[in-house]
Amino acid sequence: MKLLELAGPLLQTTTGSAAKNMKSSQGVFQNWLMSEAGLKELSEQGKGTPNSEDQLLADALKKIGEWLNASPEDQDKQNADLLQTLSKLTGKQLDANALQMLQNLLQAVESKMSGGTDQLLTETEKIFSEAKTALSANDSASDINGALKSDKEQSNQENEVSEPAKELIYIQMFISQLVEGNKLTDLGNGNEAHAIYQNGDQFLSALEKKGVSQQLIQDLKQQIFTKAESSSKLYSMTASELKSFQSLMDQMSMLPQKGTKEWSLAESQLKAFLLSKSSESSQDFGKSVLTPLSQSSSSKNASDVSGSIQPVDSKSGLQMLFSGYRGIGGVQTLDLQQMSSDIPNAETKTVADQVINAWKQMKYTPFGRSTGSFTIRLNPEHLGFVTIKLTNENGMFQSKIIASSQSAKELLEQHLPQLKQSLPNMAVQIDRFTLPVQSGDQPIYGQLADEQKQQQEGQRQQRQKKQSNDFGDLLDEVSMVEMEEEE
């Protein structure tokens, strides 16, 4: 600002060696600033009766509010007290309300300084105008020199910064320091994120030596260890996320080799972590999740099974997405036809793509520690349904994909390599994939094409009777939970 430029000589003569160290030590700058403003050093602030952090902040906000509501004349009288108040906030973690109050104070101070500058510039223009008049009215050199000397003296007098103006300069600088300091604290985890990023090459090299898939390494490079450090998602993580990721890196680096149970679990967690970060920025499925399936195994037949998509917040979405978190496994139904309005050209997607997209939508088992199943209705309708079951036997995950029609099964078999490669990267490590032929003890979900109904109705009823007790109990449990929620 122009007022700061006018006050430049004053600031230059008072900074001394403290200004040289301003970049390397914020405390040195604050001490110098308070000494120039006539305040005590930071080291002396602790004397007297100590107040709690909350009380200190409340008193400071009250003082700032009083200054903002005061008249211009009273504000000038309160400048010194305001400086003392701001000095007490040095090094404190400020909440959003306090930062907003400081922003309001900064705007008010800058507005006040801007008003004083405009007045000062007006007076300066008036002086130069009078000087021109004097030059044109006087022919002698002595008269001209006298006029210039008089004008120079008047200009110097006008350029002198008043005491309230100097205090406003200090207040402005103090507020800027407090706001910037808290911005660094909020980004706060920048040092931790930078430290993790610096170890990225070493971590990736260790993973390559242990035979980790190139797809996983590529995902790490695209999301975490990017070419441009500022693009890394490390800087958008919370402190707890950074701590978890660092712990996961350390664990995988210390494990002797790939193939152990511990390694499989750690690798599953890493893939789930990357998936969660990828899904946060994805716009394809992030705005909607599934509502729980409401049915019983005895009273509702398969033609009544359908899912719906409703927007919910992320916290409730996790609970609704996967009923397996109740501890007994779960069943979810995904209606891809209802999603067709959100997904362009859904009919043109392959069966494998539909399964993969459904897996994404489910955010299935975020940390690879839950089991269950969910059902997908395929597009077009005559393909019927596909059920994906995930089980955990002795710490090893297994996935079974059950097709309700022969045509869907054949299409899935054609794309089985793609499924094997893609599904584990979505959330969990799959140790064994099976795609069995439809048998009598496997349920069929949904309504088949018209030409298949009559032939398969009798078979469907027989298959329903032969469902396993565990699966029937599971559906009963889900139904009971949903009925309780409706009541």
Curated annotation (Swiss-Prot):
The alphabetical list of record keywords is: Bacterial flagellum biogenesis
Which branch of life, at top level? Bacteria
GO cellular component annotations, sorted alphabetically?
A: bacterial-type flagellum hook
Q: Pfam families attached here?
A: Flg_hook (PF02120)
UniProt xrefs under CDD domains: T3SS_Flik_C
Residues covered by region (Disordered)? 144-163, 286-311, 447-487
Question: Is Nucleotide-binding among the key words of this record?
Answer: no
Which residue stretches does the UniProt record annotate as biased composition, category Polar residues? 300-311
Task: Look up the record and give one Gene Ontology term from the biological process aspect.
Answer: bacterial-type flagellum assembly
Coiled-coil stretches noted in the UniProt entry, renumbered to this chain: none
What the record says about family reads: Belongs to the FliK family.
Q: What does this protein do?
A: Controls the length of the flagellar hook.
Q: What is this protein called?
A: Probable flagellar hook-length control protein
